[in-house]
Amino acid sequence: MPIVKVAEVARKNVDYVIIGGGTSGLVAAVRLSEDPSVTVLVLEAGQDNLGDPKIDVPLQLGHTFRNPQYDWAFMTTKQKNANDREILWSRGKGLGGSSAINFYVWIKPPAADIDALEKLGNPGWNWANYEKYSKKAETFHLPTTEQTDLYPHTFDLKARGTSGPVQVAIPAHVHTLDKLFQETMVNKGLKAINDPYSGDINGTWIASSTLDPRTWTRSSSATAYLVPNISRSNLKVLTGALVSRIIFDPATADRERTATAVKFIHGDAIYEVNVDKEVILCAGTINSPQILELSGIGQPEVLSRVGIDVEIDLPGVGENLQEHVSTSTIYELDPGSSHETWDLMRDPEYAAEAKALYAAGKGMQRSGLTSFSYFPLSLVNPEESRVLIDRLEAEVDAQPSQ
């Protein structure tokens, strides 16, 4: 079993140390450990949380937010355009990373966005390759006739994977409001997308979820990749291990700086593990650059301010962070409405009944977020859209030539 005690890895030598047991870290660990001749260690700051109903049961989504057992709960600096508020930025903490706490929506970007990466000078980063490997990760479970009769859900099997580790399905419990929302969007002029996983999401559509319909539990990177390979003797996972620094050998005339060890905090003590081949940093958007900077890799001006010796001058570390914004608009239904919503779960008696139904493979606990519409601002406010485009084009034109 790869989840080990700290004494089993401290001061030991391993071939690969992977920092972070989220999605990228666990996928890398499982792929590397396919070679039985190498040893792989994953250091994860959070806990394993395997079998935890707050993660596994679909309608428990949101219960993990701000909870330090599951969520890093980062807070931004004060945001000028958000009335100087500090905004919560939830990131998964524990095996599976954010795939263990997100809203389990299976979603893919537009093909044009991926192809743009290749056009910027990254050969191979194109939609054709992205589609190939994203399908390889997925097993899409066909919906039942009952689901398709109730849901405005269509799909194209050519865009779906059939033998990957991540289980993908249509949530079993449906809401009449989802169907009405889709019909309303079409009536407003949006096209209904046959399958949003084909590279075109500009319209209105029903999403699939990372749920395993055999158990109606979440399919995270921990359950999809780690659990099926948990018996590999050359794969070890240490949870509760907060990495504080990557240690390097000095550069020589024959080679560049080489990572030789990783220092981490476990409990109240500091430990090291030695690395024979590579350190692979998969600690996420926030923690990865932080670990690099703590290791002396980054902008000298930033490092010197906090007393960190510069190992490698790499000014891009920790810069150019961007994130999309989430805002909510809430509408109350007429008290006499027959539409069923998640508000019913606020009633302890109903919640207890739903829990019992879930144990029998029935009921609202098998719900998910499914209705989506993507459309340009020009569809609803062409005047404001034109103003924004003109402003952005002017800003681009004002930039000095490179």
Regions found by a protein language model. Give the residues of each.
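N-terminal redox-cofactor-binding region of secreted/periplasmic oxidoreductases
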Residues: M1-Q402
